[in-house]
Amino acid sequence: MARTEYSNKLTGDNIARAKANELGCSPKHAVEIAHLVRNMMADDAVAYLEQVIDLKRAVPFHRFNRNVSHQKSLNGKTFGTAAGRYPVKAAAEYVRLIRSAQKNAEYAGLAPEKMVIIHAAANKGRCIKGIFPRAMGRATPKHKDSVNVEIILREVQ
């Protein structure tokens, strides 16, 4: 695993950060969730993502929305699009990461309930290569993508 740095170099007394490398979820789903949780309060983001895990609310898909069906839980006025899905694995990883950033904020002496997500980014991680045996002695490549996710929280007054 390669050591990676934060893409945003924000520092300060009211900043808390968390990062996870090479997660086993879809990079496209991670990008869409990062777009969703950016500028949300941390507790609100966790509550929304827990509803996504329970398949109650959908994540709006803005970028990777080709052939994505419209969801009743999304109205076009709130998010600007009605296309969405329920990325359960990526949502669970984001919940774990946001809670980790809140614990880092608590350790730094900040109030975790007053934290807002000012930066959320998802980048492609390492591709784990594999092969899938086929008939007649052939083989098909079977690659598994990973994703690097980072969250930065700031305390609001």
From Swiss-Prot:
One of its GO terms (biological process) is cytoplasmic translation. Keywords: Ribonucleoprotein, Ribosomal protein, RNA-binding, rRNA-binding. GO terms for cellular component: cytosolic large ribosomal subunit. One of its GO terms (molecular function) is rRNA binding. Pfam families: Ribosomal_L22. CDD domains: Ribosomal_L22 (cd00336). This protein binds specifically to 23S rRNA. It makes multiple contacts with different domains of the 23S rRNA in the assembled 50S subunit and ribosome. The globular domain of the protein is located near the polypeptide exit tunnel on the outside of the subunit, while an extended beta-hairpin is found that lines the wall of the exit tunnel in the center of the 70S ribosome. Belongs to the universal ribosomal protein uL22 family. HAMAP family: Ribosomal_uL22_A (MF_01331_A). Part of the 50S ribosomal subunit. This is Large ribosomal subunit protein uL22. It comes from Methanocorpusculum labreanum (strain ATCC 43576 / DSM 4855 / Z).
